[in-house]
Amino acid sequence: AHLLGNVWARDWSHVRPLVEPRGSKAGYSLTEILKSRKMGPIEMVRTGERFYTSLDFDPLPETFWRRSLFVRPRDREVVCHASAWDLDLRDDVRIKMCIDQTAEDFSTIHHELGHNFYQRAYMNRPVLFRDSANDGFHEATGDTISLSVTPEYLVKIGLLSHVPDASSDTGLLLGRALANVAFLPFGLLVDQWRWKVFSGEVSPENYNKAWWDLRLKYQGVAPASPRGEEFFDPGAKYHVPANTPYTRYFLAQILQFQFHRALAKTAGCTMPLHRCSIYGSKPAGARLKAMLEMGLSRPWPDALEALTGAREMDASALVDYFAPLSAWLDE
């Protein structure tokens, strides 16, 4: 954490100022724009909703605005970790987060609403089919929309006056890679550790050692001081004691770029993939909606094919997205 700014080394964004190339800054700060516009939590969520309605999704129900939590309450303690909820098997969808005027929260809103619009899309399916095609699809849907929060999109909605030139692309891509690509090893190892524990391959007296062995194998990181079996470091990750599967986040990192490439093509985007936004594209919205409405009623390869035309998950879209950054690193 003292080196990378994250206790699990799952996000390396905090080292960006140390590694980004000179002259490659984005040219704008979305956080500063949101603050200067005095854009409050409700308007930030309304902006996220308008992204989805621009794709021809129905607006969120009135109950969403009354029952969601957007601001940290002053009269009680709450868990501010952002989450999306579907509460009555009909149309009572909500989000729960303590929204600040930051670029991160602006993107998170677009992500969390992806869960809500997915939940509404499969609402008319039998109850057993009211879920995503596999665990990764739910996370990937919101992440896909977050990939469309580009400078081009910010210009269209009036938050930027002009699109920065291509010289800023390396810095923007580096920032996203430090969050997305750096996450992949950690996203893979959490459930690898859990499966080894459940199978008995790792015994209780080696829980912590097995955790750090995987951290070193996949992430190349080691503890700053000795961590014996008197510690239980995996338990510091919320998803372990909460019994929440973690592979879904690894899969989502692959799927979101595959979804984004397919939808960008449907939207007719001819720019480099990292500059494409599907905002306002009803054809892209129709393709996305067709997949979301399937819910869990079909095997996940069918849902993937409905959106991308392929039946296998494919990381080549991630490679395509970061191609300009890869070329810069090669130089």
Where are these predicted regions, by residue range?
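Short pre-active-site segment immediately N-terminal to the catalytic Zn-binding motif
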Residues: 34-39, 90-110
